[in-house]
Amino acid sequence: MRVLCVAEKNSIAKSVASILGGGHVRRRDTRSKYVKNYDFSFNFGGNVGSSDVTMTSVSGHLTEASFPSEYSSWSSVPQDVLFDAQIITSVSKNAEVLADNIKKEARNAQYLYIWTDCDREGEHIGVEISNVARASNPSIQVIRADFNNLERSHIISAAKRPRDVSKNAADAVDARIELDFRLGAIFTRLQTIQLQKSFDILQNKIISYGPCQFPTLGFVVDRWQRVEDFVPETYWHLRFVDKRQGKTIQFNWERAKVFDRLTTMIILENCLECKTAKVVNITQKPKTKYKPLPLSTVELTKLGPKHLRISAKKTLELAENLYTNGFVSYPRTETDQFDSSMNLHAIIQKLTGAQEWDSYAEGLLAGDYRPPRKGKHNDRAHPPIHPVQMVHRSALPSQDHWKVYELITRRFLACCSDNAKGAETLVQVKMEEELFSKKGLLVTEKNYLEVYPYEKWESSDQLPEYRLHEEFQPHILDMMDSSTSSPSYITEPELIALMDANGIGTDATMAEHIEKVQEREYVIKRKKRGQGVTEFVPSSLGVALAKGYDEIGLEWSLTKPFLRKEMEVQLKNIENGQLNRNVLVHMILTQFRDVFHLTKQRFDCLKNSCRVYLMSHNEPQT
């Protein structure tokens, strides 16, 4: 039996071939310097049995969408014709040598074994590979490996338990590709032609539209507008300070702030007339700081910028590199709960021997282990991101690789630990009718915090002794004024959280959309003043587009998340077999026809917005 295996990347093909071939692998060059063929023998069992195997790969998607040549002229073809124009799906020029390699290797094979990533995109790439292989061998049988990491026993098990490629998942991607291609072409042509005619500054610029990029831009502009509109307000509060046992204790006024000076003065005078404060409540209770949930892709892309000072896109790229080298599990997953059948102790055992957490891992194995918390998400395809093998810092190609590996590993160990525990004391005092309070925290067991330095929970200065019903005179009781603080520009973790909550993109594509709006020069990334974190501000063009679409008066503006969110829900329904691909495409295109015609009719709103914001040349400082 001859079997052709095809992975999504050469690094995966090389790793899987090495595992299945048991070290007896012959490498052959292809016409692509990035892709090799690996020959070996393996007994798959079942219907396939002992086989001569060739493992090769693609480099992502093989095919691309295009319109026939008669639609290529932007100036002579009306944009709305593209709603119904034929779409040609063909092997992209960059992938032709890869497709030729698959055709050649498939000719004498009885089985095509798909080893692409086990996500929605991977299923579609699997279908693309199948179509190419069947062009040279129509009778080839197609099966698919179900795997989520490159640990040896897992790969061997996956090789012996194939499944079918998910047509529903591939159909969902096919629908998304068509919709993004049509809508991107239609609105990009409309915007570019109309705005280039009106503004010299845009003469050589493509004003690109993307169904996920524009809502991403909208989030950035919305936060920018809040900053622009902010007017500080003065407020007043009472300061209550006590001194005892050598400690200075500042209580918090439970009204927090009052925006009327006279009212605050009257309250202060009443308290001063009272002269003494009375302790009305002393509460001591246990406090718990819960350990983190198992790690999902969205959470990883938020933690990278926040704690590692690495962009979301770069964090995900580094995690994927760690995955292809067999150090961590598949990093594109929505799942934040471990299946009860997973042997987490075995993973912890592999992590011993590293000086960074050896003693901590040994402690978990010796009895400190606690089952991980269960989140609310399970994509049924992949477990949460976790380490698969121990790797030492010196074995990785860069410090950033280590930072991401360390984060994933420490997060996993934290998940397998106990919550942090402490005790909180609350003292409430009353003066006239005003309540003032002070809390003190004593952390008694750090537990997961010992291995997870990305979160802090520290004991406060301990409160001196207070007795219930005790009366005393405050050391200081006066009135202070302050001003409300401006909102800040949006950070990358905040932007990802908004995109996730509103269904903009998938866990695997959010970081790419953020990069894309920067490439399009709609959004600028800059260092937050006085801090190491970065923030996003819109460019003049970004503001002009967002404001212009808002002025058009669409029921759902293209820079708001509602249209894309609904589409993502429906794509899930296709994946789950609850909706037909063609039905969704027709429904979305009908919806966007109305959006297009109203946008074209009121395009002066966009032009006026560009006059206001582009002509100011007031770009944010980077």
Curated annotation (Swiss-Prot):
EC number: 5.6.2.1
All copies of domain Topo IA-type catalytic, residue ranges: 166-596
Domain Toprim: from-to ranges: 2-148
GO MF assignments: DNA binding; DNA topoisomerase type I (single strand cut, ATP-independent) activity
Class of the enzyme per the UniProt entry, highest EC level: isomerase
Catalyzed reactions per annotation: ATP-independent breakage of single-stranded DNA, followed by passage and rejoining
Pfam families to which the protein is assigned, alphabetical: Topoisom_bac, Toprim
Keywords: DNA-binding, Isomerase, Topoisomerase
Gene Ontology BP, a term: recombination within rDNA repeats
Spans traversing the lipid bilayer: none
Active site: 330 (o-(5'-phospho-dna)-tyrosine intermediate)
Family: Belongs to the type IA topoisomerase family.
Summary of subunit composition and partner proteins: Interacts with hus2.
Protein name (record): DNA topoisomerase 3
